[in-house]
Curated annotation (Swiss-Prot):
Keyword Chaperone in record: yes
Pfam families: TPR_3
Gene that encodes the chain: ygeG
Protein name: Uncharacterized protein YgeG
Keywords: Chaperone
Residues annotated as transmembrane: none
Length: 163
């Protein structure tokens, strides 16, 4: 084994210890790799631009990168979910929306609404209904409530037609 290889292993152990220490304190990977908030904002701008232009495949690449390096950012999670959903990656989108909701400091019931849509796409109608009823029972935003109510009525009508 060359001295260069040994040096890499020594540095790797040191880096691993630094990583463990930083992560145990709740620091994100972006800071550990020198990705400043400004750099992350610029990457997010690219992702958002691709997303707005309908290029969800490229947007997904950037959102995934952002989530890896700044996982606690609810906007990154929500936007990553929003590109997974039209690609019919319903479970992944649902999980990302759920994480986004948990990281957001306020109740964003539009995220739960999207979670319900994902459950419909995944054919988990009971879970979708739970999402929509949660909105009806807890949300104060009439716009989101009316959309949830429309899904409840539609799903109830479909279950009566099929039952």
């Amino acid at each position: 084994m060359s001295t260069e290889t040994i040096e890499i292993f020594n540095n790797s152990d040191e880096w691993a210890n630094q990583l463990k220490h930083a992560l145990s304190k709740g620091e994100n990977l972006a800071l550990l790799h020198g990705l400043t908030p400004d750099i992350l904002d610029r990457i997010y701008a690219y992702a958002f631009d691709y997303h707005e232009k309908g290029n969800i495949t490229d947007a997904e690449i950037y959102y995934k990168f952002l989530c890896i390096y700044a996982f606690e950012n609810h906007e990154y999670l929500k936007d990553f979910a929003s590109v997974c959903q039209p690609k019919k990656k319903y479970q992944q989108a649902y999980d990302l929306y759920k994480l986004s909701y948990n990281y957001f400091p306020y109740d964003d019931y539009s995220v739960i609404y999207r979670m319900g849509q994902c459950q419909i796409g995944a054919k988990n109608i009971d879970n979708a209904m739970q999402c929509f009823y949660h909105i009806i029972n807890n949300c104060e935003d009439d716009s989101v409530k009316s959309k949830a109510q429309a899904y409840i009525e539609l799903l109830n009508d479909n279950s009566e037609d099929n039952g």
